[in-house]
Curated annotation (Swiss-Prot):
Primary location class: secreted
Localization terms from the record: Secreted
Name used for this protein in its record: PBAN-type neuropeptides
Family matches, as Pfam families: PBAN (PF05874)
Species in which this protein is naturally found: Helicoverpa zea (Corn earworm moth)
Keyword Transferase found: no
GO cellular component, one term: extracellular region
Entry similarity comment: Belongs to the pyrokinin family.
Stretch forming the signal peptide: 1-23
Additional comment: Juvenile hormone seems to allow PBAN release, which then induces pheromone biosynthesis.
InterPro entries referenced in this protein's UniProt entry, alphabetically: PBAN, Pyrokinin_CS
Tissue-wise expression: Expressed in the subesophageal ganglions. Not found in corpora cardiaca, corpora allata and thoracic ganglia.
Highest taxon in the source lineage: Eukaryota
Length: 194
């Protein structure tokens, strides 16, 4: 904050001194404007032209006015809430690197030790005979012999289903109670028989 004020005061003083100390005299031998073939003719100052030279006393007064304005600016800037004040710029540039490892990669590439992980089968799938399993797993996934059906080897029901079911309704009915000959007739004109 103080550095910003010093910079503002320095720029104000530099601008004032460059404006006040500006020399409007034409240098000897220098061509000016589009008419450079004046051949040593000297034209006097234009009538009514004001000089920008101010006496040294006026320079001091202007300098003090600039300092007073800079002080007032700093005072009102300090009165602003902290959220509205500009943060001081950082002098050094820091580059933050956030390291996110890729999935499946380890941080230590030299240490390639793999942990023994027990295999958990999917729901509804049976363990094959060649796949080793711990005794606890064998007991957990063993089913009752009554629930095991020969169809499960060829057809797997929904996940987690182990009960017997009939694929179509009416297939388990005994046909002894029904007559031997059933006549089924369909009408072509969509009429119903009563």
């Amino acid at each position: 904050m103080f550095n910003q004020t010093q910079l503002f005061v320095f720029l104000a003083v530099f601008t004032t001194s460059s404006v006040l100390g500006n020399n409007n005299d034409v240098k000897d031998g220098a061509a000016s404007g589009a008419h450079s073939d004046r051949l040593g003719l000297w034209f006097g100052p234009r009538l009514g032209k004001r000089s920008l030279r101010i006496s040294t006393e006026d320079n001091r007064q202007a300098f003090f006015k600039l300092l007073e304005a800079a002080d007032a600016l700093k005072y009102y800037y300090d009165q602003l809430p902290y959220e509205m004040q500009a943060d001081e710029p950082e002098t050094r540039v820091t580059k933050k690197v956030i390291f996110t490892p890729k999935l499946g990669r380890s941080l230590a590439y030299d240490d390639k030790s793999f942990e023994n992980v027990e295999f958990t089968p999917r729901l509804g799938r049976r363990l094959s005979d060649d796949m080793p399993a711990t005794p606890a797993d064998q007991e957990m996934y063993r089913q009752d012999p009554e629930q095991i059906d020969s169809r499960t080897k060829y057809f797997s029901p929904r996940l987690g289903r182990t009960m017997n079911f009939s694929p179509r309704l009416g297939r388990e009915l005994s046909y002894d109670m029904m007559p031997n000959k059933i006549r089924v007739v369909r009408s072509t004109n969509k009429t119903r028989s009563t």
